Amino acid sequence: MLEFTESRELRLNPEITGQISESQLLIQEIQAAAKVGLSALMALWQGSIRPQRHQPEVYQTLGDVFLLAGEPLIGYDVLAEGRKYWPQNLRIRQLLALALARSGATISANLLLQELVKEQPRNEETLGLLARTHKDLWIQATATASQRLHLRLAAQYYQQAYQINQSIWTGINAATMALLQGKPSMLKPLPSRYAASVWCS
């Protein structure tokens, strides 16, 4: 589908271009560029993607790969542009909040995620991200009252997120927050393997 020339530039295989949409081709191109490195991703962002207005999945994919590459500021720029065209797209806003959190703008990320939770109170991804920002705010806090508040909220949102799909990620974090609060009784609803993972870490 995508081929590399000897100069490491990306080019599309013309045999399949008529079978899938332009946005799907770009998503495949982004995924291929991610394997090459940051320079290839930047070339896409500054070249074939930025001047055009594609489907939100293109911005989601590109923003996500920049985050995975450890470039939250560039990821933020990508996702912020995507949000201008799709202001209600949930995934773009979730990734935008993650980019903010990873960039150190924890409060801004927290406020955005609070808005998303109001819209969809039972979305595990949003609840888990909101919990993560409260965990970060707990770490950053200097006042005891603020530390207690954010630790309690982190535990609360991780518990809520876990109850939706019972995923490993939210389960381990919920168990960790329970122990940090000194409330081992909160571990009872969680599988023993999550508590064991926390005790051993």
Predicted feature locations:
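Amphipathic alpha-helical repeat scaffolds of TPR domains
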Residues: N13-A32, P51-D64, W86-L98, R102, ...
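Canonical positions in the second alpha-helix
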Residues: G47-S48, E81-G82, E115-L116, Q160-A161
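Amphipathic, non-membrane alpha-helical rod segments
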Residues: S39-A40, L44-S48, Y59
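Residue-level detection of beta-strand scaffold positions
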Residues: L73, L79, A109, T133, ...
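Amphipathic, oligomerization/interface secondary-structure segments
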Residues: Q140-R148, Q160, I164-Q166, A175-S201
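Helix-turn-helix repeat elements of alpha-solenoid scaffolds
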Residues: E29-A43, D64-D77, L100-L112, T144-A155, ...
